[in-house]
């Protein structure tokens, strides 16, 4: 696991559009199919004429770690999480390709610069080499000479830091988003805040194939 699910990796979205009654909220929160529970709850929200608008990364430490890597990373990850719900795709490379097409952050794409892929590769590498969501990060890597990857079949891959591009490409090609349990971390439930606004949390958990 590159990034484990925890409250620190919650991304908070505001539900905007048609107002939802307490009955609507209870009904959506009670949706509990054996598969695709989060997608079904998301679809129920959108069917009511609502949409999710990214609000913030809940944990200030993780938020600061992401901003230190790149100020746009919180918004990029939020768009990846929404794209996963809309498309059903979970591999990070495919999700990045899809948001590169839609370009939600409005980057200048005239020269086909790989903005989204570059930033996500930087995040994956940093997570692999020491950056943890709930710990303030200095920007220094834990490993000095290289990195060993033990695959599920027992094969061991060795990447030296002078070959960082290959290491980044390996992570990028093999990383996928995994949904954590909806019974933990206030994940994928509609929450009525004290100010009356409605929140819906998505969790950012990254594993390797």
What are these regions (language model features)?
Residues 1-209:
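Short, positively charged
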